[in-house]
């Protein structure tokens, strides 16, 4: 949930979460694409920040959360952290995006799915109108 509002639910799959038992957490994401994020881009990226929001809603007594991207092809790691203000901003921006999409759909606008190579890494084939059955590229 984004905040306490039931109408803003997000579903995602985290690659890895670590903790030291003392309230310090790390959220890891493994990227296989050609391009690595710059530090500036990582500091603005929403994906792992949304995972952090999910973690914060499920776990008490969190002291710190480090966001870590592993770029496999380049052998590099990029780390970032979010302040409470950053988290509030991500929540608000994400809610606004959801509201925009809902508004467009309720006014007869379309939001057509687009098939691409990225579909091979998607866990939502069974819910997608462009795919059939479960994703054969992903093992459960």
List each model region and its residues.
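RecB-family 4Fe-4S metal-dependent nuclease core
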Residues: 1-140
């Amino acid at each position: 949930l984004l905040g306490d509002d039931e109408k803003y639910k997000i579903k995602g799959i985290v690659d890895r979460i670590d903790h030291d038992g003392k309230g310090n957490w790390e959220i890891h994401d493994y990227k296989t694409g050609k391009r690595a994020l710059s530090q500036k881009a990582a500091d603005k990226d929403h994906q792992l920040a949304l995972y952090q929001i999910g973690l914060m809603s499920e776990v008490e007594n969190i002291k710190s959360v480090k966001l870590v991207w592993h770029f496999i092809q380049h052998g590099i790691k990029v780390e970032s952290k979010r302040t409470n203000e950053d988290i509030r901003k991500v929540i608000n921006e994400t809610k606004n995006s959801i509201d925009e999409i809902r508004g467009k759909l309720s006014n007869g606008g379309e939001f057509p799915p687009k098939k691409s190579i990225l579909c091979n890494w998607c866990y939502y084939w069974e819910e997608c109108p462009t795919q059939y059955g479960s994703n054969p590229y992903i093992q459960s």
